[in-house]
């Protein structure tokens, strides 16, 4: 209950002569709305002679009925507070919040009560608006019964007609209905309201430093069932959807987040502005028919349901129920994940789920200011409205939502910036104290968004601050289909998309595409279709006759997928194709066996019954085709995410930079459901050199840690590495972290080498027998220990440059030199 407002105005009253209930009501139509011991303020007569009584089920009522004598409210302040007043010995307002007043056998009215020591036992005091509404005369005896609302009788939204209470107070200046609605919720939160109730409302316009006293009449009330609405919003399957829809009620209790709408009285000079004016703001506190696709959000149903359960479900219950539980609301949510997954779009819609105060959306860098202390002041300003409302009405305060985009810009780890007095540290300290400091606020919800969760100060991530941490990951196939339907809805509506376009097939082919990349794919397909209409010639101009026939077809999507849009968390096809530029030459059953082992390991990773994490190293001499075999394994695995870590990508990196690059690669791989990580040439990555020896211990330790860390639940990772020095890996302990080791052999027989030579297609069939005979002789020599396939291909390419008659002797001479260690 909010305290009775303190007003300084003291007015006189005129005694009302009463003969009967109806005769008093006719006389009082011209009496004052507010009365005190000195004067009155005239108001316009009410539009209705008698408001209908709320029809309430008997189960809503409690016993302990008493007879009371009607008295007038002690002061204007009491009237403005909108309570009926009784002595504590009759009803204690700490135990009884509302009463039902029966002035006659066919009528009853619901009031919220307050104790007042000036009211004698057996008396109940009402303000003039209440006495007019219930047609109560002074000294009239009424039956009063304690009353309790059921959970289905809470106010979701309420429409009130408003007018100036006196002609002398009429002004043409616009009144902000949004500020009025906020002030109304603060003053009257937790009170009972009935259809037709008359009341006085004093609104202080702080922007213009003016005070207005208005007469209000409750026009309609839309209620909802708190329990069923919360269950439906959180995804309960057994909830009747019709039971959660708002419905008209005769009486209900006002909640802090109830939607208040003001309509001006017919013929009134009142000028209202803002979203809470008229029917524009007429909406329920929770929309059970919330449609993510209409809001432009797809693939995030699970995330929304989880956030509602953790952060919003508790806020739809009455404050007194939360106090009985001793519960504190969640004050913060952190949305993190890869770029383009819909974090910002999700945050824009979160505030609309409860119809709370208009969210304050601020970019992280906007907080920073060049002047000393202004950055901290900007943080304090964001919480100023919530602090003021919390001081005034405590638990009855409405929800204030503050959204920080790119929160990592202002909430980095303290001490990570240069200088001990960095402005970033003081901003973090200010935000920490506002969210959960000495003066705790229970009416705020801070939503932060970032791509770099690891940069956020750990004190901000504890319970009580950014307590709910939700990863917004890449959409699955169902989510991708929802997103594609959203971005193609207008095209389908206006028949601008060929009906043969199969969005389900596109969603299957766009593995690991983010929401932003899917939007870009649709945009690229549209551009491809529009390009067909551009006339060829010196000037670029569209063909006006073909514009009406424009239709985006499946070919446009295929072209966009092939050439325009590549997912950031997709396959590194460019790197894989570079490693396989010579193709995959199966020179013997050894190659087939190696590829089969790789396929078996990939299938093991895919199997949901297994752990989903395997590591393998391809070890062999230099130029034996290890990288090509690893690339072929990665490509044939058909995993949507393939990342290549190559020494050439880290040239010039410091040891710390290499470790960060490795860590980021593993983190990116673990964000995808199915991932392959190819680490090429471990020795070069570690900076190993046998002279010394010299190597990077920091990189080795990073690899030991990362290769031992399995992916999160539901994610699967296959790590393939290559190495030319098996002894070094064993000495450094790296061999122990690889679950499987596959040896890559050299070509040691003439038949194996002939398979490669035949694939080159540079020798005629007549030359091949002589080459095979000479190679067999070389292989039998004591100095020949085999040749790597890459080395053999290099020799063949060198021979290709010769004239046709010299290709055979050139190749054989180089092979003989290889046997004599001339080409090692």
Swiss-Prot record:
Mg(2+) binds at residue 627. InterPro entries: AAA+_ATPase, AAA_lid_3, Asp_de-COase-like_dom_sf, ATPase_AAA_core, ATPase_AAA_CS, Cdc48_dom2, CDC48_domain_2-like_sf, CDC4_N-term_subdom. One of its GO terms (molecular function) is metal ion binding. Gene3D superfamilies: 1.10.8.60, 2.40.40.20, 3.10.330.10, P-loop containing nucleotide triphosphate hydrolases (3.40.50.300). It holds the Pfam family CDC48_N. Its EC number is 3.6.4.6. GO terms for biological process: Golgi to plasma membrane protein transport; intra-Golgi vesicle-mediated transport; IRE1-mediated unfolded protein response; SNARE complex disassembly. Binds 1 Mg(2+) ion per subunit. ATP binds at residues 582-587, 622-629. PROSITE patterns: AAA. Its cofactor is Mg(2+). The keyword Chloroplast does not apply. GO terms for cellular component: Golgi stack. Keywords: ATP-binding, Cytoplasm, Hydrolase, Magnesium, Metal-binding, Nucleotide-binding, Protein transport, Repeat, Transport. It catalyses: ATP + H2O = ADP + phosphate + H(+). SUPFAM superfamilies: ADC-like, Cdc48 domain 2-like, P-loop containing nucleoside triphosphate hydrolases. It is found in: Cytoplasm. Homohexamer. Required for vesicle-mediated transport. Catalyzes the fusion of transport vesicles within the Golgi cisternae. Is also required for transport from the endoplasmic reticulum to the Golgi stack. Seems to function as a fusion protein required for the delivery of cargo proteins to all compartments of the Golgi stack independent of vesicle origin. Belongs to the AAA ATPase family. This is Vesicle-fusing ATPase. It comes from Caenorhabditis elegans.
């Amino acid at each position: 209950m909010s305290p009775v407002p303190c007003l300084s105005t003291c007015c006189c009253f005129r005694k009302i002569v009463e003969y009967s209930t109806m005769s008093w009501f006719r006389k009082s139509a011209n009496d004052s709305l507010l009365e005190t011991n000195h004067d009155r303020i005239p108001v316009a007569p009410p539009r209705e002679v008698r408001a209908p009584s709320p029809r309430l089920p008997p189960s809503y009522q409690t016993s302990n009925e008493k007879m009371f004598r009607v008295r007038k409210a002690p002061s204007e302040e009491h009237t403005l507070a909108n309570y009926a007043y009784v002595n504590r010995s009759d009803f204690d307002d700490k135990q009884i919040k509302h009463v039902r007043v029966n002035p006659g056998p066919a009528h009853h009215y619901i009031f919220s009560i307050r104790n007042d020591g000036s009211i004698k036992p057996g008396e109940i005091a009402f303000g003039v608006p209440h006495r007019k509404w219930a047609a109560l005369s002074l000294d009239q005896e009424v039956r009063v019964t304690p009353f309790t609302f059921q959970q289905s009788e809470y106010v979701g939204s309420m429409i009130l007609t408003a007018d100036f209470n006196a002609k002398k107070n009429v002004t043409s200046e616009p009144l902000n209905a949004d500020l009025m609605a906020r002030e109304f919720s603060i003053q009257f939160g937790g009170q009972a309201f009935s259809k037709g109730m008359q009341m006085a409302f004093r609104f202080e316009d702080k922007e213009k430093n003016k005070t207005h006293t208005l007469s209000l009449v409750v026009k309609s009330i839309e209620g909802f069932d708190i329990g069923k609405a919360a269950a439906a919003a959180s995804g309960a399957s057994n909830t009747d959807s019709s039971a959660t829809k708002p419905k008209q009620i005769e009486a209900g209790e006002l909640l802090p987040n109830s939607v208040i709408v003001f309509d001006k009285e017919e013929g009134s000079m009142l000028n209202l502005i803002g979203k809470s004016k008229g029917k524009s703001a007429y909406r329920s506190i929770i929309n059970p028919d919330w449609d993510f696709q209409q809001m432009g959000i797809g693939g995030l149903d699970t995330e929304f349901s989880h956030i509602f359960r953790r952060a919003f479900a508790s806020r739809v219950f009455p404050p007194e129920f939360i106090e009985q539980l001793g519960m504190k609301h969640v004050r913060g949510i952190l949305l993190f994940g890869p770029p383009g997954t819909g974090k910002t779009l999700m945050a824009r819609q979160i505030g609309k789920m409860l119809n709370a105060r208009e969210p304050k959306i601020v970019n992280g860098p906007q907080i920073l200011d060049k002047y000393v202390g202004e950055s901290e002041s900007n943080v304090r300003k964001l919480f100023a409205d919530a602090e003021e409302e919390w001081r005034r009405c405590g638990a009855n305060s409405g929800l204030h939502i503050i959204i920080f985009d790119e929160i990592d810009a202002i909430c980095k780890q303290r001490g990570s910036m240069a200088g001990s007095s960095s402005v970033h540290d003081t901003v973090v300290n200010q935000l920490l104290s506002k969210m959960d400091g000495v003066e705790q606020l229970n009416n705020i919800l801070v939503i932060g968004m970032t791509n770099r969760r690891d940069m956020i100060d750990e004190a901000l991530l504890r319970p009580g601050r950014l307590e709910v941490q939700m990863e917004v990951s890449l959409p699955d196939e169902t989510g991708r289909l929802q997103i594609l339907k959203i971005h193609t809805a207008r095209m389908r509506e206006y028949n601008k998309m060929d009906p043969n376009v199969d969005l389900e097939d596109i969603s299957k082919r766009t593995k690991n595409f983010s929401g932003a990349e899917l939007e870009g794919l649709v945009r690229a397909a549209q551009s491809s279709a529009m390009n067909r209409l551009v006339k060829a010639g010196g000037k670029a101009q569209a063909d006006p006759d073909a514009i009406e026939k424009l239709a985006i077809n499946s070919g446009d999507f295929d072209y966009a997928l092939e050439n325009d849009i590549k997912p950031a968390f997709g396959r590194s096809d460019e790197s894989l194709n570079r490693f396989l530029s010579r193709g995959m030459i199966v020179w013997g059953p050894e190659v087939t066996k190696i590829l089969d082992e790789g396929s078996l390991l990939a299938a093991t990773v895919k199997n949901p019954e297994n752990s989903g994490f395997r590591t393998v190293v391809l070890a062999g001499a230099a130029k034996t085709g290890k990288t090509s075999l690893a690339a072929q394994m990665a490509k044939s695995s058909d995993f949507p995410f393939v990342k290549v870590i190559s020494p050439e990508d880290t040239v010039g990196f410091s040891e710390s930079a290499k470790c960060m690059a490795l860590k980021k690669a593993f983190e990116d791989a673990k964000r995808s459901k199915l991932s392959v990580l190819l680490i090429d040439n471990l020795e070069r990555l570690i900076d190993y050199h046998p002279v010394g020896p010299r190597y990077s211990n920091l990189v080795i330790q990073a690899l030991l840690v990362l290769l031992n860390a399995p992916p999160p639940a539901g994610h699967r990772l296959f790590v393939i590495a290559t190495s030319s020095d098996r002894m070094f890996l064993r000495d450094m302990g790296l061999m122990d972290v690889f679950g499987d080791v596959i040896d890559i052999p050299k070509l040691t027989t003439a038949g194996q080498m002939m398979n490669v030579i035949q694939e080159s297609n540079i020798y005629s069939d007549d030359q091949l027998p002589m080459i095979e005979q000479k190679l067999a002789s070389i292989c039998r020599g004591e100095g020949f220990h085999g040749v790597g396939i890459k080395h053999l291909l290099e020799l063949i390419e060198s021979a290709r440059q010769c004239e046709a008659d010299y290709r055979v002797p050139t190749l054989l001479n180089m092979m003989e030199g290889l046997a004599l260690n001339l080409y090692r």
